[in-house]
Design a protein with these regions (language model features):
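Charge-rich, low-hydrophobicity low-complexity segments
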Residues: 1-355, 363, 409-590
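Detector for repetitive beta-architecture
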Residues: 329-331, 339-341, 350, 358-360, ...
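Feature marks extracellular polysaccharide-active and adherence modules
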Residues: 335, 343-345, 354, 362-364, ...
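Leucine-rich solenoid repeat scaffolds
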Residues: 380, 395-408
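A general structural signal for short secondary-structure boundary/capping elements
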Residues: 376, 386-389, 406-407
Length: 590
């Protein structure tokens, strides 16, 4: 190997979190992005930073995109910008004080993004573009589906269920295939021929390489330190190999492209490597009678920030509860979990639920996004900067989020409800990642179609207050949070209070009946019997039973397993923790 060789790979974060998990509008094709690249360089207020008002002018006036969609892309890119928790909380407070659309627009006008980075972010939306040829080849014919004409939404949902956001091989292929077009967007307009193609003697300024660092990073041979691409090319040997000229202070486009093709490799911190050689975690139990073993792997012990990954697959009929440093600021993927109860009570970078069924998932605060893909009958409870749901059915999602929930194609019978739980360290975790209780747009979803937001009220509903029940995290932990952050919306709070009043009225009725000791015993037996029958009818007996695994000693003092030590744990309503003793003792941390 050459002493001065380098390895370059696609960064995980822009592909995982930046590319929306649906086909982009046609107006975001490379043809229109080339025009935009030339336009922003010749207009005041567009380069090197692009403000919201100028982007809205380009998106709505030039590209004919709806304003909601223009803001979606701008906001999504801004969510990835590195900001301190204090800055995020200040921004949330400013948004929450806006009382009118005009005030909101004035506040948004204070945002600006790096223009070259934003251009590449828009180009990155091509990652999940639907290929008609691939769809036709992949569709078996004749098939039962061919007897009835499939709607466009069904075909789109099928395509979106195969999104490539976690596929590091797809990331590498995307960059290798489209490297020429990517470099075109970064080149000065004068460096392109009349056909829009870079000439053989085209040049690229070092500032453009900083834009390319959004997508690429790497390391020198025999070195473990990871550098953005422009810093890696700041080293003299690599500058020479990549065609840097000290005279023109620029790179040869042809030589740079050739060097990148030779240096590009698979991301050593991606999902493939994590599955193959990541550290395995013995957090899950193997359930008798199951064909596949639960797998949990991580690379958090060696990956740089933004590339920390924890993969959990095949969790079946068990409860997994963790508050661990191994989860902190990690990108978590839950894959094919079935009839499981999962509590990940740490600050997380991002979370993806893929092909999960009949499960409950409760998350700590998520810095960027939670994505639910191809799931069925999942109950999700989380605080997150963004929620996206695609190709999923009969899922109930309780969320606190400062952005509009993004509903992608293929959803059926979703239910959106307010965030309705807490655990003792929740508010501390929220503050540590910069998530506030306001604004909270949980009930204002944005429906995303192939050509922009398309209203489809049949795909979701807002949870009726009559069906609302608070969720109690059934583990004892140290901390100060003792109620739902921000409280419940008034109509839901009223429903809870009315239900509590009915319970109190019923208890008073029992007390006023003046039952003797034998009658009280018989009545208690009857209540317990009916309660257990209700648990079986509602399918919640398994949730209680799964809280009784054998106690496991944490492998690390900061790796807390929130397992239950009591013989029969109880789930109790808020403010009634002394009541309902029929099921047993309160679970504690082992």
């Amino acid at each position: 190997m050459d002493v001065y060789s380098a390895s370059v790979w696609p960064r995980l974060e822009p592909f995982l979190l930046g590319a929306l998990q649906a086909a982009p509008p046609g107006k975001l094709s490379v043809h229109y992005l080339r025009k935009m690249a030339s336009y922003v360089r010749t207009r005041e207020g567009c380069f090197p930073r692009l403000g919201w008002h100028m982007w809205r002018h380009i998106a709505c006036g030039k590209l004919q995109l709806p304003e909601d969609l223009a803001w979606l892309y701008f906001e999504t890119f801004d969510l990835l910008a590195p900001r301190s928790p204090e800055e995020k909380l200040e921004w949330a407070e400013a948004l929450s004080q806006c009382q009118s659309p005009r005030e909101l627009d004035r506040q948004r006008s204070k945002l600006s993004v790096d223009t070259l980075h934003f251009l590449l972010f828009l180009y990155l939306q091509q990652l999940n573009r639907v290929s008609l040829r691939t769809s036709l080849i992949g569709e078996e014919w004749p098939s039962p589906r061919s007897r009835s004409p499939a709607s466009f939404s069904e075909r789109e949902a099928k395509a979106s269920s195969h999104n490539k956001n976690w596929d590091d091989q797809a990331h590498l292929t995307f960059v290798q295939t489209h490297l020429t077009e990517i470099l075109e967007l970064l080149a000065e307009p004068g460096e392109l021929s009349s056909s829009g193609q870079p000439p053989r003697d085209g040049q690229l300024l070092p500032a453009a390489l900083q834009g390319l660092s959004l997508l690429l990073e790497g390391s020198a041979s025999h070195g473990r330190a990871v550098h953005p691409l422009h810093r890696l090319l700041g080293r003299a040997p690599f500058q020479t190999q990549a065609g840097y000229s000290k005279l023109s202070r620029s790179y040869s486009l042809q030589k740079l492209q050739s060097w990148l093709h030779q240096a590009l490799t698979l991301n050593p911190f991606g999902m493939s490597t994590c599955l193959r050689s990541g550290k395995k975690l013995a957090w899950a139990l193997q359930v008798e009678g199951t064909m596949k073993r639960a797998k949990i792997a991580r690379n958090t012990h060696l990956a740089p920030p933004g590339s920390r990954v924890v993969l959990m697959s095949q969790l079946y009929k068990q409860t997994l509860a963790k508050d661990s440093e191994k989860l902190a600021d990690a990108n978590v993927k839950l894959h094919r979990c079935n009839e499981a109860f999962i509590y990940l009570l740490s600050p997380l970078r991002s979370v993806t639920l893929d092909k999960c069924r009949n499960s409950t998932v409760v998350l700590g605060p998520v810095v960027t996004s939670v994505h639910v893909q191809s799931c069925e009958s999942v109950r999700l409870v989380c605080v997150a900067a963004r929620l996206a749901v695609g190709a999923s059915s009969h899922c109930t999602i309780h969320i606190l989020t400062p952005t509009r929930p993004l509903l992608l194609p293929g959803n059926v019978a979703l239910t959106l409800g307010p965030f309705h739980t807490y655990y003792p360290t929740l508010e501390d975790h929220m503050a540590s990642v910069g998530l506030a209780v306001v604004p909270n747009l949980w009930d204002k979803p944005l429906l995303f179609g192939a050509d922009g937001p398309t209203p489809d009220p049949a795909s979701y509903r807002i949870l009726p207050p009559a069906e609302f029940w608070p969720l109690v995290v059934p583990f004892q932990m140290e901390g100060d949070t003792c109620e739902v952050p921000g409280g419940l919306p008034p109509t839901y709070q009223q429903a809870v209070e009315a239900r509590e009043q009915r319970v109190q009225d019923w208890q008073k009725t029992v007390k006023d009946a003046h039952l003797n000791k034998e009658q009280r015993r018989q009545f208690q037996v009857l209540v317990e019997q009916k309660f257990h029958e209700w648990l079986l009818e509602r399918g919640q007996r398994q949730e209680l039973d799964s809280l009784l695994p054998a106690a496991v000693t944490p492998s690390h003092p900061t790796d807390s397993a929130l397992s239950t030590c009591g013989s029969q744990p109880s789930l109790h309503r808020p403010k009634e923790q002394a009541a309902q003793r029929a099921v047993g003792r309160t679970p504690t941390v082992c």
